[in-house]
Amino acid sequence: MDESKKNERLKQLTDIQYNVTQKAGTERPFQNEFYDNAAKGIYVDIVSGKPLFSSTDQYDAGCGWPSFTKPIDEAEVKEHKDRTHGMIRTEVKSVDADSHLGHVFPDGPQDKGGLRYCINSAALRFIPVDKLDDEGYQAYKKIFE
């Protein structure tokens, strides 16, 4: 992502969006926008707009954050060890904007690969399936066909 475009987008973020994506913050469980979202659509990086997750891979993990079994395209996310807060976890970031998204854990549904991408709502923007064309994400409609 172009640095000047990224800086422009960062200025538009709310405090919680900035804290989560740029300072690796975490929003409160069960008190965020998408933890119980049941609508069909895709989730894009709040900074870059790159598609990251689909509602077709979302499930209720009971943790209080949106949880997914996989990203839409693994090339759009990167992972690295996170040793903060006295734990060893795997952080998930977006490739294009380098936004902190959340963490991935090996306790997801076994029949779907066994991973749980536990993602902060504040790092995401939801595009409902009926708005994909309007928002320029028409290529992702095939996920829902």
Curated annotation (Swiss-Prot):
Gene3D superfamilies on file: Peptide methionine sulfoxide reductase (2.170.150.20)
Q: What is its EC number?
A: 1.8.4.12
Name of the protein this chain belongs to: Peptide methionine sulfoxide reductase MsrB
This protein's UniProt keywords: Oxidoreductase
Q: Name one GO cellular component term.
A: cytoplasm
Recorded GO molecular functions are: peptide-methionine (R)-S-oxide reductase activity
Which reactions is this enzyme annotated as catalysing? L-methionyl-[protein] + [thioredoxin]-disulfide + H2O = L-methionyl-(R)-S-oxide-[protein] + [thioredoxin]-dithiol
Name a biological process GO annotation. Answer: response to oxidative stress
Provide the MsrB domain boundaries.
Answer: 6-129
Active-site positions on this chain: 118 (nucleophile)
Q: Name one Pfam family in it.
A: SelR
PROSITE patterns xrefs: MSRB (PS51790)
- Does the keyword field hold Hydrolase? no
**Similarity comment: family membership:** Belongs to the MsrB Met sulfoxide reductase family.
Keyword Plastid in annotation: no
